[in-house]
Structures are given as structure tokens and as C-alpha cells.
Amino acid sequence: MANKQLRILIADSRHTQSLLVERLLNRLGYHRIATASSLDEARILGRCTGRPFNVLIISGRLIVSEPLDGTALAGVSLNGLIYQSQYLPQGFDPLTVDGVATRLAGALELAQLGAFMAQVDPQAAYPRERGLALHP
């Protein structure tokens, strides 16, 4: 069973992609989800409550849309997943998290998201479903 208390932030400039990621998370049992369409929104949402999100799921396209240093997303989340990471420069790691940090090139699929969330939330049991995927 998914931990219903996990706070998750999805950051993607494309609203339809954010909705697809949210749908994947819902299928895994997660519903405390916020979305951001820019890095500024992600930073504000991640820092305004005084405690970071448990998980940040962010598009590599969004990250390269603004100049940033390696600490620009510090304090936003405890764990992070970057999908479409092929857009990031080699060796550049914008995630400064204490927990799990994962980079995925290309589309985000349910199996990949389930594997990442299993590292973040080890007590959860995830169905082995296929079919939903994000496409660049």
C-alpha cells in the first residue's frame, strides 16, 4: 500500500505531461500531488511550507529552459526523479537531495516510476502494469 502521506511535486512546463505523470502516480496509489509549470514555481512551492516535498518529479526540458547552478533546486525535495534527462548537459546534476536521485532518458513509464517510488516508499507494493507512458 502506498504511503498516503508522501507529498509529491511534479514540475513540467507542459500541462498535459504533468497530468500524465499525475495519472501514473494515481495508479500507484499516490494522491498528495502538486504541480509546477516553471522552476520558479517549483522553488516557491518546495520552500514556502518550511518542509520540502518528499518527491520531486521534473522534466529535463524544464530544467534546461532556465540557467541554473547545481543548488537551484536545493531544499525543494528529499528525493528526485528527472525524466527526459537527455536534454541535460553531461555531468550536470541539478538535484541536491538527501535520498534517492534518478535520471531517466526519454519517456517516463509506469514501470520506471514504480521502481523509483519503491526506493522512496519501500513498504508499498506496486502492480506490474504496462500501458501508460509519457512521450517527448
Tell me what each language-model feature is.
Residues I57-R61:
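Active-site residues of response regulator receiver
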